[in-house]
Structure formats: structure tokens, C-alpha cells
Amino acid sequence: NNLVILQKPAHLRHRTASLVLCIVIINCMLSALTGCNSKKLALSSPISVTDYKLNTYVQIDSYTNVNKNVLSDALGLCDYYEHIFSRTLETSELYKVNTQQTTAISDELYELIELGLYYSQLSYGAFDITIGSVSRLWDFNTDTPDVPDSSAIADALAYVDYTKVSLSTDNDGTHHISIPDGYCLDLGAIAKGYIADKIKAYLIDNGVERAIINLGGNVLCIGQKRNGSDFNIAVKKPFTETGEYMEVLHINDYSVVSSGTYERYFYSDDGTFYHHILNPATGYPYDNNLCDVTIISSESTVGDCLSTTCFVLGLDDGMKLINSLEGIEAVFMTNDGSKYYSDNAKAYIN
């Protein structure tokens, strides 16, 4: 067996971030394909493309023999959607919405905002896509992060309330959004899952039958390995750089998404720990004893939304939500390293 570990190269790591997921692929090195009716040649070693997009390390490994340009074009979708969903990019569609430059929005932005509002409601506002007025005060990507002024946070909280956002569609199909002046939508917690699903659809449309898409904390599989076995997805243990894994999940044609306190964080001068998952009620990071939530689902969009939603709901309410949903499983990890599993999560664990 040939064990391959995919993780973010040291020169691409930000000092306050660590890659959420590693992909572990075990190739059995079969000498011939048997019983395979695929129209395209299945590979034992992948065709790979890598890049740095969406503020993370991204990679596609195709186990179908296709032109490498197909994979590069698929990763190019990251740029396309960033110009729609980015809160900070001044040329993006969302930026223009947040700055009241437009009310007419694209199908893609309408779809993602509608989804964000649904999960904001599902969490009773514990997750809120209007957190942008607060999140723009926190910069977890700078080399010198600092805690925002408390009065600035208090002022920003006056502009956090997802119920003030409304969507509509004209008879001709044109979508519109209405948000109060001063409000700022932030779709960063859910956009990568949506983009991963779009990349998967593009690859399938272009003949890819077996592949792994890795957008940092979002891993999405197409099909299974050429011998019919599952892909093995290793969920990195929080706050480690030594290759320790929280779990190794066995999936095919499914998604694995993790959200946690270790993705972006810093320590203040007095040693206080601050991470990027902010509480819409306080403007400060959540402190609910969770450090990671990993979601197993068929769609990465759903996994992205639920990983954040379940994190902010906390262990008890988050677990209740997952166990009420069909076809979705989760693994929760608390700060002491204890792991908690949804009803059928262990079916994906060795």
C-alpha cells in the first residue's frame, strides 16, 4: 500500500492558521482493472492541480484520466465565485450589496444568501450572516492581530440582525435584496461549501468519475477509488502540526467539512485566546468548550452550513440538530480532546 498525505506546505501556512483536513489516500496498486465498466481510464496515481485561492490551499486529485486543463479550469471557479461572494473584494457583487451600490443580485448570490438566512433562522440567530459589521473589525490574517475596541464592537452589534434582510424576485426572474444601511453580510462561513459543490458538478460534466476536491476545510469526493473502496479522509487533530488525526473517515461520493477554533486565531498580549467564530450576541468569539465540528454529508454546501451552525449551537443543541436530519452525521470535539458522535457517524470510521 502507498500512503499519501496531502497537507498545506509549510511555506503557505499562516502562523495563526492550520489546515483543517488532510487527505489520506491509500492506493492498492492493482496490476489490472477488473469488472470496471467506466468509459474513462481509472488511475492508480492521481492527476493533480494545486493553487492558493479563497485564502486557503486548494487541490484537485483526479483518478480519472482527463486533460489537466479540466482540473485547472475547475479551480478557476474559485476566482469566479470569489468575485460574487467576497465581503472584502471591492469589485465583488456582495461588496456592492453591502455598500448599497445595487439591489439586483445574481442567481448565485440569491441562492447563497437564501441558504444563509435559513441557517440563521435554524440556529435562532446564533449563526447570523449579518455578522459582517462585527467580523470586519477582527483581522485574523494580519501578522499583528489585535482585539478591536469594545466600543466599536458595541456599535457594530446594532447592525447585526438577519431578520432585517429580505429577498424578492420580479416577474421577469430578476432577484433583489433589501438590507438596512450600515448592515454588512458575511458569507465566509458557507461560501466554500457552495463553491466545492459547483466544482464537483463541473468536473462530472467534463467526464471526471473519481476525484477528491480539497478546499482547505472542505473535502468533497467524486465516486470512489478505482478498486471500488472508499476514500480515506483524515481529519486533522486541532492545534497539532505532527500529523495527528482526530479521525479517519471512509467515504465515497460524499463531503467532509470541519469548522473549529484552530482555523484562524491569535493570542492577545495577556495570553487570551481569540478565534474567528464570532458570537452575534456579543461580538466576541464563542466560548462553548467546542474546538471542532466535522460534518459528513452528500453536499458540501450543507456540510459547510451545518458545521458552523452546530458549532455555534454548542454540543447538546448541535447534536440534537444533526440527529434530527437524515443522511447527515457529525463528530464533535471539546477542548479537552473528548469526541462525541452523532447516531450513525461511526459507520464512516474504521
Show the residue positions of the predicted features.
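Mature catalytic core of soluble alpha/beta enzymes
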Residues: L3-I5, P9-C22, I26-N350
